[in-house]
Amino acid sequence: MSGLPESKLGTKQYWDNVYEREVSNFTEFNDEGEVWFGEEAEERIVQWLEDHISTSFREVSEAAPFRVLDLGTGNGHLLFRLLEEEDTLLPSPCQLVGVDYSEAAIVLAKNIARHRQFSDKVKFQQLDIIKDSKFCSKDWDLILDKGTFDAISLSGELLDGRPLNSVYVDRVRGMLSPNGIFLITSCNWTIQELEERFTKNGFIVHSTVPVPVFEFQGSTGSSTSVIAFQIDPSFNRK
């Protein structure tokens, strides 16, 4: 699985600039900003939750709420979408957290949460999971990624000589609970490429999400790939 060409979309400065503009737009026009990959991608995630929420996750309690982490949350739209149907989509009690390495993104998400009166139901925090291990404890039941692995894959940075997308895979594995699920949506990698990358690094495939397929010059493909992984229980013994 080769890397992607380096791009400005893989830099923190690019996303800081994007979200600083969106903060201004929200303040002036109540414009919540772009829905990354479109609302159709979010509806596929909602459908996946409807199909799997009752069979794939543990029992929850007040002492041990269901924990959802959205990596690269941006304007927080995905978590807001889940909250719109929280009674049917999510176990109760539930803790929703969105993190992003752009402080401007977190400002925007918090502003939107207040506007929608969701501030008491979701938490947003500035965090670079590549460089900060604050959330790297194995207690997240559901980790969501909608475009974050894509953006990281466009970075030319290295950490200890490793591409950041390789470090990212390890970070996610370190945050996921033993029976938790990592659900990733990508527009840059195929299902096969994602499966190859993650199953070589301690994951097994839980399920895939059907997406529209197009055909061009005899080849078939899709605009996005959506796949769910769990931790391979035998990984540390290999």
From Swiss-Prot:
Residue stretches in coiled coil: none
Keywords: Cytoplasm, Methyltransferase, Nucleus, S-adenosyl-L-methionine, Transferase, Transport
Enzyme class: transferase
A Pfam family it matches: Methyltransf_31
UniProt GO MF annotations: protein-lysine N-methyltransferase activity
GO cellular component: cytoplasm; cytosol; nucleus
EC number of this enzyme: 2.1.1.-
Location(s), subcellular: Cytoplasm; Nucleus
GO BP, one annotated term: vesicle-mediated transport
Record's function text: S-adenosyl-L-methionine-dependent protein-lysine N-methyltransferase that mono- and dimethylates elongation factor 1-alpha at 'Lys-316'. May play a role in intracellular transport.
Family of the protein in this entry: Belongs to the class I-like SAM-binding methyltransferase superfamily. EFM4 family.
Protein name: Protein-lysine N-methyltransferase efm4
Source organism of this protein record: Schizosaccharomyces pombe (strain 972 / ATCC 24843) (Fission yeast)
